[in-house]
Structures are given as C-alpha cells and as structure tokens.
Amino acid sequence: LKMAKLYDAISHNKRNSVILIIAFIIIALGLSYFLGYLFENAFVGLIIGILFVIIMTLIGYYSGDSLILSMHHAKEVSKKDDAYLVNTIEGLSIAAGIPTPKIYIIKEDSPNAFATGRDPKHASITVTTGLRNIMDRQELEGVLAHEMSHIKNLDIRYMMLVTILAGVIVLVSDFILRSFLWGGARSHDRKGGAGVILILIGITLAILTPIVAQLIKFAASRQREYLADASGAMLTRNPQGLADALKKIRDAKDKV
C-alpha cells in the first residue's frame, strides 16, 4: 500500500511538473511579447522570446550537466579510485532498474551530493570529499539512494528545465524594467490612459513574476526532495541511514 501511494505521488508530481513547465514557458513568452510592445513591435518581441527560450533550453538540456561539473572542477571516479563508492552506486542502479550513472567527486570540505543530467541514460552523481570522509557505509548508501531517486524520478530533467525557464523569466523581466530607463516606453505616452494602465500592469507583472516563479520553483523542489527521501528509503530498505546522514550534514554545516 505504501509503495502504491509513493508511485501515485511520483506520477502526480510528474503531471504537475509538465503543467508548471508549460506555465513558465507561457509566462516567459508573455513577458517577451510585452517587452516587444514597449518598443512598438510586440510580434518581434514574441519571436525573440520564442527563440531565446528554445536556445537556452537546448543549451541547458544538452550541456547543463557538463557546465555544472566543469564549474565545480569535478573529477570522474573509477573503481580504482574508490571501489566502495562505485560498487554502491552500481548496486543501487540495479535496484532502481536504471543504467549506472557516471560518478564524480569534488574536492570540497562541505558535505554535499547532487545528481545531474537529462535522463537516466545521461546522468551522473557527484559527491564532495567532505561528504565521503564523514559518512559511514549506511549513511553514504542513504545519500546515494536519495540522489539515485532523483535520476529515476526524472527530477534532474525537471529541475534543469525549471531553472532555465525561471532564469529566462528573470532576464526578460529585467529587460522590461530597464527599458524604461532606456526610454523604450516613451512612444506609448501618446496612447492615452489605456496605454499607461497596460504599461503599469506590465511593470507590476515584471516585478512580481520572477519572485513568484522562484517561490514556485522552491516549493516544487522541496516536494521532490521529500519523494526522493521516500524513494531512496525504498531502495535501501534502511531509512535510518539517510536520516543519520542528513543529521551529520546539518551538524557539519552548523559548524561552518
């Protein structure tokens, strides 16, 4: 029964994710349209917005993980480097029924781990040396199972797309606000009260939309973390391992 409820929650989350991504795309294009309107060519603004969303999404979808790993100077791990880490991830992959992700490590004292990629066939799990050094075997297995669940549940793809689209919304909103500094809205002064009201509505949306988008993103991310905890516990059959690991991570960060 618990397993069925978990699968139902994951399916429900995936449906909500699709709706949220579509909503973010519509918002980004709507803001682009309004930006074009300020410069008296709403259609061009919409076309530019569509191209911008497509380009940024493609870059993030196909290169986002490599950019993140490169930014953190992550090094790929082999069995020769850390046999237990590799063997544990291979075992969890079999239990989850997905291909074994690539494994990376970052020389960083702060205990952390994350999964990246666009799908289970193109995924990786990264841990810091700080995490590797303070975790015992059960705790490490719990953390890795949590990250494996993010891969299996396609959280990695969703969060990458949402992060990109939220970034696009922030950028377009910033362009809208800056356009008034550049004088882009001056030509609408002659359009009377209706034009002024529309511009005020647009400015309000440009200010509030990025904030709302980030809040929605954080709320959705938190829900996915809960589901990854539950899915990870199902993989290891040992929820205490992850609970102890999270306590260690929290204590380590409190000391910083």
Predicted region positions:
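Polar-ligand-bearing catalytic/cofactor-coordination segments
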Residues: L1-L29, Y37-L38, F43-I47, L51-L198, ...
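S-adenosyl-L-methionine-dependent methyltransferase catalytic core, i.e., the SAM/SAH-binding region
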Residues: L205
